[in-house]
Regions:
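Catalytic alpha/large subunits of respiratory electron-transfer oxidoreductases
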Residues: 1, 6-7, 11-12, 17-18, ...
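Short, conserved phosphate-binding/catalytic loop or strand-edge motifs used
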Residues: 21-34, 206-208
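Aromatic/His-enriched, Gly/Pro-containing loop or helix-boundary segments
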Residues: 32-46
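Transmembrane-helix bundle segments that line or gate the permeation/cavity pathway
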Residues: 51-53
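Alpha-helical segments that scaffold the active site and NAD(P)H-binding pocket
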Residues: 56
Length: 290
């Protein structure tokens, strides 16, 4: 921290934006240090943004540090894959086409200039040693690596075999909900070509009784940027700090602006401003108004 100029921007970010003051200024004069509270760590889901707000580079990204020079990187615009918000990001790629850093791309209607930690650092999973990067076919009870032509031929024969024996309705396809639109389009096009129409991405949903009543996309006609202007907001069955930290940040700004926040969930772990005081803790109530 020898570069630190004690501007306290990181401290203010954790308090004013992230909502959890996990950093503070200790000691006095030229001995001042920025540090977490004794025995504590920085656990905010938005903590990576303090790297961006630091004006002198005293706070850096550990996975990226000392890997490549910034001017050697190519920059690609993209969308975050880990939430439904569609936050804009800038993916930095080195000369070997390897992703080495992900930064937020400013979009005031979505993520503003912030980014959640899971979208900032999850690129490391692309190169994890346990990630499967080549197709595998099970032979004699063991998984054997094969080329793509062999794997696709094997899959086609297996699908056609089930179709011939049991009909196309006996085949179902479940895809990840975080797949890209292009990936899902190719998958459904391929499966419909062989007569399979049972496709879905709702891996966790158990009750489908209300699907027939849905018309179009369940959209309420409001964007996250409108939260600050709403008089009241309702959150149903979601722990936003973990599931949608950027939405939670928007809700905090709305409550600071005077909006009422209503929550419907069995247990909560929140810190939301309420006039001159704050509420923080686990509240065993089915309905809360803050």
């Amino acid at each position: 921290m020898t570069r630190c100029i004690h501007c306290s921007r990181c401290v203010r970010f954790t308090d004013e934006i992230a909502g959890y003051q996990e950093l503070g200024m200790s000691y006095r004069n030229n001995h001042v240090e920025v540090m977490p509270f004794i025995g504590k760590t920085v656990d905010s889901e938005l903590s990576g943004n303090i790297i961006d707000v630091c004006p002198v580079g005293a706070l850096t990204s550990k996975p990226f540090r000392d890997t490549v020079r910034s001017w050697e990187l190519s920059r690609r615009k993209s969308i975050t894959p880990h939430d439904a918000l569609g936050s804009n990001v800038q993916v930095h790629v080195d000369k070997y086409h390897k992703v080495v850093r992900v930064l937020p791309l400013e979009n005031e209607t979505l993520n503003e200039c912030w980014l959640s930690d899971r979208d900032r650092f999850s690129y490391e999973g692309l190169y994890h040693e346990e990630r499967i990067t080549t197709p595998k076919v099970k032979q004699d009870g063991k998984w054997v690596e094969v080329d793509w032509d062999t794997a696709l031929t094997y899959a086609a024969k297996s699908i056609n075999g089930v179709k011939m024996d049991h009909g196309s309705d006996a085949i179902g396809v479940l895809a990840s909900a975080i797949s890209t639109t292009e990936e899902l389009h190719i998958l459904q096009k391929m499966m419909r070509a062989v007569g399979v129409n049972n496709l879905d991405t709702r891996l966790d949903q158990q009750d489908f009784s209300g699907d027939g009543k849905l018309q179009g996309v369940p959209y309420l006609g409001s964007s996250v940027s409108d939260f600050i202007n709403n008089k009241a907001l309702l959150v149903v069955g979601s722990l936003l700090r973990q599931e949608q930290p950027l939405v939670m940040q928007r809700l905090r700004q709305a409550t600071k602006n005077g909006s009422e926040l209503h929550l419907m969930k069995k247990m909560f772990w929140l810190k939301l401003s309420l006039k001159s005081r704050s509420i923080r803790g686990r509240l065993p109530i089915p309905w809360g108004k803050f």
